[in-house]
Amino acid sequence: MEQALERALKRSETEGKWRQRYHFTPPVSWMNDPNGLVYYKGLYHLFYQYNPKSCKWDSMHWGHAVSEDMIHWKDMPVALKPDQEYDCHPEGGCFSGSAVEKDGVLFLFYTATTQIDGVVHQTQCIATSKDGMTFEKYPNNPVIKEPPQGFSNDFRDPKVFKHNGKWYMVVGGCIGSATFDGDGRICLYESDDLYNWKYKGNVLESNGKLGTMMECPDMFELNGKWVVTCSPMNHPDYNKSLYCVGTMDFENCIYTIEKMGNMDVGFDYYAPQSFTDKEGNRVLIAWQNGWLWMPWCIEWGPTSLENWSGCLSVPRKVQLDREYNLCMSPVKDVDYLISQHVTYTD
């Protein structure tokens, strides 16, 4: 398979009419959500949902690329593949997650998907690395074996962060069916050591207004406020990624919303994930899930004929203005890619 991938990559790069030059694309085959964005040992690491065998979503792996500037990326070997009993469901695999560093070790958190007696189960798991290139799955996976009581098995996309000496994890979940009549939730967990987690409550609840499932949640602090983002399934708004700004009581798991809005006015900005760059800025990258990637629109889009499908947004620096609007601008190195300027006026 490795030789076949190399041949496909050469064809895709040399003959690709649609191959992106401005946005990150997979070397070959299908990609979607960005995962595990982190600056570690002098390099930016970009992981992403990846199916190395097809231009269609299936059997999720974690693709991997590294960069010195978040613009020019070098493809690396696949970081995670579904090879354990708890993550080997053929229509699942190693779903989305995040990365943190602790004592020089890189921790990857991901959702493992398997099937038991015909029922799909989603659990939260760990893989670690001391060099950022080779990863070992934790022998006692999964570290969170089931969703909170009353939740469905749609329980995925852990985002881990540190606050006041403790580790926290937000995970997307729902009451009912994520596909049809569910009510989305963002769950909060707490840990002292990254291995043992305690459920604290829900940061955000849909209550019939914010979709049936809150995929790819994120939570980070900006200017003394806490920003919560997610990509709700079946949300009535056409724009697919939302943000909230407010205050957070971690001890009692009470999030008070002061502002809410769309993260992007387009329809192709899904599963955004944030991380801190080497200068301390908060940066976001998202999957550009334009409709041409989807099977019901021109099969899988013209890029599938070139052996690849999917791309990511350029990295965006995130800030809050005085009215707590979430403001984004391309990171500074993007300017080097612009060779011609065009100005539009109202």
Where are these regions (language model features)?
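Active-site metal-binding loops of divalent metal-dependent hydrolases
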Residues: P217
